[in-house]
Amino acid sequence: MLHLYNSLTRKKEPFVSLRPGKIGMYVCGITVYDHCHLGHARSMVAFDVMVRYLRSQGFDVTYVRNITDIDDKIIARASERGVSIDELTAQYIDAMNNDTHALNILPPDHEPRATGHIETIIRLIQRLLEKGNAYVSDNGDVCYEVDTFPEYGKLSHKDIEGLVSGSRVEIVKEKRSPLDFVLWKKAKPGEPSWPSPWGEGRPGWHIECSAMAMHELGEQFDIHGGGLDLQFPHHENEIAQSEAATGKPFANYWLHVGMLQVNGEKMAKSIGNFYTIADVLKEHHPEVIRYFLLSSHYRSPLNYSEENLLNAKKALIRLYQAVKDVPPQTADSKLDEYWQEQFNQAMNDDFNTPVALSVLFQLAHEVNKSNSPALAHTLKNLAGILGFLQKDPESFLQSGLAEEEKLVIEQLIAERLQARAERNWAKADQIRADLLSKGIELEDGATGTTWRRIAE
């Protein structure tokens, strides 16, 4: 049975969906004012694998991942660039789609944008005003009054009184409490705005996600996810406003992905230590990046380094070598039940991908010993749930080399062929050994000599 670590209760719990066989999942997406960095990729890959696994277990998953396309950062960046907000967001949405496609991240079933749900957001704010959980401030903003929700803090488990007394939140004189947050921002000159019962303005960030999640999945759904940095205040505020409006639990399970770090610090645009997905893709195969991102449990911090990416590359080479000579899978090919069960046990333990990867390596060892097509097909199928081992093995094993390097290898193969023809076995063996020392393995066959990279 699947068990998930629920941030709400701080423990692993058996997963029971609201509707048998069906799962509603909402994940906070990106704010499109810049290119996605590898920290975004970690979250997107983690939830992609969760969706793939749940579907492999027979669940009908409705996966929603939003796009924040109106925000202070977007407005500021568009102004800096001298472009319209629509131009800016379109550019970075296209870039995000290119990144996710390259990383083999499945598209969500629904990808709502905040600007497409203004009426839904306004209706939700009206409900909160009618119930007494929100107020119109002196400056025209509509704010949520945190003191009206006694359970505030139940997700992040923070000392709320300490936050207020320590002034660790922004003090705004128009708010009744420092913890109150804006639901609707009064329009400012030159900024985008929409008509509302409270005048022209635009939605606050927190209310956008609540409104879009409820629009796509209903007032209650199964799983809400995002990066650990969103737990407070974003997800805490989502719970407060959603449950105040409906009187029901918002999401049953809250999953949070640990931070990607560089030298022990969170990778973030605000710090300036981030690597864009596009830049990393220039240097590394997409499946290598996926493997690296899954090499640590999704809740744990993960350190970015070239060494860790190299280790991921070597690991994938070993897996690809195990399946390189396997005949194509046929309709009647059966998967090995024992290895499926071992893999499922790992994934049922809160999507434990490091253990799942160790199962794949044990299976690869068996494939190498037995050369069994059934085991090899099982290996490819299980790895496919993690989103890799899906390329042509020869293509992958020759990837990552410049064309000039490939030409040198082909030239050396030709020289070796000539040496063999001249019965100069010492030279032929030396060329093979030299290439092997550089991680290039030669294989002689009836149709000639082929080569592939191997794990050094």
Swiss-Prot record:
GO molecular function: ATP binding; cysteine-tRNA ligase activity; zinc ion binding
Cofactor note (record): Binds 1 zinc ion per subunit.
Motif 'HIGH' region, residue numbers: 30-40
Transmembrane feature ranges: none
Cystines in this chain: none
EC number: 6.1.1.16
UniProt xrefs under InterPro entries: Cys-tRNA-ligase, Cys-tRNA-synt_Ia_DALR, Cys-tRNA/MSH_ligase, CysS_C, Rossmann-like_a/b/a_fold, tRNA-synt_1_cat_dom, tRNAsynth_Ia_anticodon-bd
Motif ('KMSKS' region): 266-270
Record's catalysed reaction(s): tRNA(Cys) + L-cysteine + ATP = L-cysteinyl-tRNA(Cys) + AMP + diphosphate
Pfam families xref list: CysS_C, DALR_2, tRNA-synt_1e
Binding site for ATP: 269
Stored Gene3D superfamilies: Cysteine-tRNA ligase, C-terminal anti-codon recognition domain (1.20.120.1910), HUPs (3.40.50.620)
GO BP of this protein: cysteinyl-tRNA aminoacylation
Assembly information from the UniProt record: Monomer.
PANTHER family reported in the protein's UniProt record: CYSTEINE--TRNA LIGASE, CYTOPLASMIC, CYSTEINYL-TRNA SYNTHETASE
Protein name: Cysteine--tRNA ligase
Native species: Legionella pneumophila (strain Paris)
